[in-house]
């Protein structure tokens, strides 16, 4: 009978049972349930005509209803995309790329000669910890938590840049202060490359574009 068959299956030693099942609660829209018939939804064709897919992917990921119901709200979408995805992540990448391209460049990456990672062991440890946390969260299918850890890397990078202020030294003559500041910019460049990989599950299109830039520079380096 069925109960006997089920018991036999359960007793099999070679049968691997699921022990990490991903499940979410409900995602609401502006306080109500999604409904195609009531035209209460986010229509992807219309959305993609005006906006980038990665911004929606980011908001859905950071607002994922993993442990309780969450609400898709357009005002929160605008706020989180502007302040987090653009203001934290995008701003960091833009600052690093802009500053790096202001350096005089012969052949290869102009930041290579400023690689002094031994001077930044504390920052590297912080970044490694964030990556480890993100990996652990992903393995446990806690994607919102993983994304927060990755965004923490961008925050570390922004703090590093702000403290080093490399824009003050780019056009200055070579000195210890200049080398120290530009070593922070060089590390920030590497952090951007790391972010391009870590963010790919959440923002694949912009990550691919960023990876192409870094792949090109690595080939020249």
Locations of the language-model features?
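Short, hydrophobic/amphipathic alpha-helical patches that form generic packing surfaces
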Residues: 11, 57-64, 190-197
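Secondary-structure capping and boundary motifs in well-ordered enzyme cores
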Residues: 36, 47-48, 77-88, 119-127, ...
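Short, charged/polar, low-complexity loop and linker segments
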Residues: 69-74, 129-136
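Basic, alpha-helical terminal appendages of large translation-related enzymes
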Residues: 136, 140-142, 151-216, 221
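Catalytic adenosine-cofactor/nucleotide-binding cores of aminoacyl-tRNA synthetases and other
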Residues: 26-116
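Beta-strand segments within the central parallel beta-sheet cores of soluble alpha/beta enzyme folds
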Residues: 19-23
């Amino acid at each position: 009978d069925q109960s006997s068959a089920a018991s036999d299956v359960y007793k099999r030693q070679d049968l691997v049972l699921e022990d990490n099942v991903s499940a979410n609660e409900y995602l609401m829209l502006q306080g109500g349930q999604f409904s195609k018939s009531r035209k209460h939804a986010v229509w992807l064709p219309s959305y993609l005509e005006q906006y980038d897919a990665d911004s929606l992917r980011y908001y859905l990921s950071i607002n994922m209803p993993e442990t309780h119901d969450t609400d898709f709200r357009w005002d929160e979408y605008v706020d989180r995309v502007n302040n987090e995805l653009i203001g934290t992540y995008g701003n960091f990448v833009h600052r690093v790329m802009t500053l790096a391209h202001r350096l005089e460049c012969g052949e290869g990456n102009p930041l290579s000669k400023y690689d002094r990672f031994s001077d930044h062991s504390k920052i590297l440890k912080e970044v490694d910890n964030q990556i480890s946390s993100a990996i652990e969260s992903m393995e446990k299918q806690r994607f919102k938590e993983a994304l927060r850890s990755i965004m923490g890397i961008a925050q570390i990078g922004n703090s590093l840049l702000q403290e080093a202020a490399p824009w003050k030294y780019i056009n200055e003559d070579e000195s210890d202060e200049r080398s120290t500041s530009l070593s922070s910019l060089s590390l920030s460049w590497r952090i951007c490359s790391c972010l391009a990989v870590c963010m790919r599950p959440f923002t694949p299109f912009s990550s691919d574009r960023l990876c192409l830039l870094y792949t090109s520079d690595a080939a020249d380096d």
